[in-house]
């Protein structure tokens, strides 16, 4: 399957590992940006699930380190973040109607990873909000991931 190329801001990213960025579409039509870093003989793939207001380039250095350790890396800009599609009413605002919409992003990401034959084992690293999204993905599609690691995960929000 062919995917349209998506932008990558070298000036914002630390790390020079070989990468490619593409546009994918969630089943509700939301356009999402994904990037993957690859190397010749991968041990598997690490999925990076970033936190709120973060963007793919922020993880360039981590991606480079993981590639140097033998892993391919796949990252996504969640809907409303980075270059992924934002709500029409305020394109500068990251917004979802329901937190469960992020699972549509996960579904599209997994479909993409399978379509480009990213090698297993598949490992997830979830930071902050990405940890919450990742934990829910494990409940829904846990058989897709072999391992998960969480960094300062957002397990919930306390009000008041």
Regions found by a protein language model. Give the residues of each.
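An N-terminal hydrophobic leader/cap segment in hydrolases
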Residues: 1-25, 30-37
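Active-site glycine-rich loops that stabilize anionic/oxyanionic intermediates
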Residues: 43, 49-54
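The serine-hydrolase catalytic nucleophile loop
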Residues: 52-64
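Conserved alpha/beta-hydrolase
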Residues: 63-89
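Alpha/beta-hydrolase active-site loop
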Residues: 94-114
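Alpha/beta-hydrolase fold nucleophile elbow
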Residues: 117-128
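Alpha/beta-hydrolase-fold enzymes
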Residues: 129-160
């Amino acid at each position: 399957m062919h995917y349209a190329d998506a932008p990558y801001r070298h000036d914002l990213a630390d790390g020079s590992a070989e990468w490619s960025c593409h546009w994918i579409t969630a089943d509700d039509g939301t356009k999402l940006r994904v990037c993957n870093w690859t190397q010749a003989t991968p041990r598997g793939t690490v999925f990076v699930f970033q936190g709120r207001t973060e963007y793919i380039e922020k993880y360039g250095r981590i991606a480079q380190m993981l590639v140097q350790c033998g892993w391919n890396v796949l990252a996504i800009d969640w809907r409303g973040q980075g270059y992924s599609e934002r709500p029409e009413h305020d394109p500068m605002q990251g917004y979802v109607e329901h937190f469960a919409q992020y699972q549509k992003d996960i579904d599209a990401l997994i479909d993409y990873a399978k379509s480009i034959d990213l090698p297993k084992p598949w490992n997830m690293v979830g930071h902050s909000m990405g940890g919450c999204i990742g934990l829910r993905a494990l409940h829904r599609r846990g058989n897709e991931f072999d391992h998960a690691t969480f960094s300062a995960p957002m397990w919930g929000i306390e009000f008041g």
